[in-house]
């Protein structure tokens, strides 16, 4: 590489930093909740980049809070233990034996792995779960299914599958106030002391709402909300999301994701974005470029 080539590369790097400056100012001191999972967690290079990106957010004055999933890791452990899984509407039926495995994997193996990614990048992350500091009080999640023989709705027992009933963010504030990055496993505790497995998207949205976060970033394995031609829709109001649901444009697995985003916005989050976690540096591209790379849902 010639001296002129090096100068050109340096100039391009300086230009990129300069372009990011308005966004760095916009988010200075902001709280950003990031739901981390899917392909972004499973591929080593993306995982390492994620850790560096979260560390960078902290370095430039943003307060990131990470909530992670761990479905593939749970599946692998259950397979090793020869425990069969049953799913209802995408939710894992979780009995007493299985919830112990779920907690071990989510609050143990995966939680410490994610915190480790960030720590190796030079920041200080602390792994916790919803049971710690009374962060998430859960209640049993109920589902019903219509009897095919008639019009009767039958209750389904999902076992120890829960949903947030109350979120107490004092432990989050304590950690961020000490300069630490909270990494939260989606396990909560009921009023009866029982442990509940909770969907990570739901936990991320509930924590973002309780914090009044500036942004919720949902890292997924899709580009965002797509129109009928498969083109990314970069920006949607809640009313526009509801219209796209009604006409079938938003369907399938995207429905619970947009529902989480809508609920977070209604609780006070300024914007919730569905972002393609398969894209390297997805968090930085979403926050520090004009228009971002995902679908922003707002009031």
From Swiss-Prot:
One GO term of the cellular component aspect?
A: cytoplasm
Q: Where in the cell is it found?
A: Cytoplasm
The pathway that the record names for this protein is: Amino-acid biosynthesis; L-arginine biosynthesis; N(2)-acetyl-L-ornithine from L-glutamate: step 2/4
**Which reactions fall under this protein's catalytic activity?**
N-acetyl-L-glutamate + ATP = N-acetyl-L-glutamyl 5-phosphate + ADP
Q: What class of enzyme is it?
A: transferase
Asked whether the UniProt record includes Cytoplasm among its keywords, one would answer yes
What Enzyme Commission number(s) appear in the record? 2.7.2.8
Return the CDD domains for the record. Answer: AAK_NAGK-C
Name the keywords, alphabetized: Amino-acid biosynthesis, Arginine biosynthesis, ATP-binding, Cytoplasm, Kinase, Nucleotide-binding, Transferase
Keyword presence, Phosphoprotein: no
GO terms classed as biological process: arginine biosynthetic process via ornithine; L-arginine biosynthetic process
User: What name does the UniProt record give this protein?
Assistant: Acetylglutamate kinase
Organism encoding this protein: Acidiphilium cryptum (strain JF-5)
């Amino acid at each position: 590489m010639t001296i002129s080539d090096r100068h050109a590369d340096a100039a391009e790097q300086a230009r990129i930093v300069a372009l990011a400056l308005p966004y760095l100012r916009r988010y200075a001191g902001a709280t950003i909740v990031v739901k981390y999972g899917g392909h972004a967690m499973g591929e080593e290079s993306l995982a390492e980049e994620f850790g560096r990106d979260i560390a960078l957010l902290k370095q430039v004055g943003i307060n990131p809070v990470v909530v992670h999933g761990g479905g593939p890791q749970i599946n692998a452990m259950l397979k090793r233990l020869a425990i069969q899984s049953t799913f209802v509407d995408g939710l894992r039926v979780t009995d007493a034996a299985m919830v112990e495995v779920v907690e071990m994997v989510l609050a143990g193996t995966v939680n410490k792995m994610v915190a480790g990614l960030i720590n190796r990048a030079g920041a200080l992350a602390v792994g916790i779960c919803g049971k710690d500091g009374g962060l998430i009080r859960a209640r049993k999640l109920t589902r019903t299914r219509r009897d095919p023989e008639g019009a009767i709705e039958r209750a389904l027992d999902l076992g120890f599958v829960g949903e947030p009933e109350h979120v107490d963010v004092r432990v989050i504030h304590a950690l961020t106030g000490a300069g630490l990055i909270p990494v939260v496993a989606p396990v909560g505790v009921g009023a009866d002391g029982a442990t509940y497995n909770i969907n990570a998207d739901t936990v991320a949205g509930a924590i973002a709402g309780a914090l009044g976060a500036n942004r919720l970033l949902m890292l997924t394995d899709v580009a965002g909300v797509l129109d009928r031609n498969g083109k990314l829709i970069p920006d949607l109001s809640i009313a526009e999301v509801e219209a796209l649901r009604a006409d079938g444009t938003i369907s399938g697995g995207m429905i619970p994701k947009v529902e989480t985003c809508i609920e977070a916005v209604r609780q006070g989050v300024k914007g919730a974005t569905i972002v393609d976690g398969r894209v390297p540096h997805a968090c930085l591209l979403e926050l520090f470029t004009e228009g971002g790379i995902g679908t922003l849902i707002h009031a």
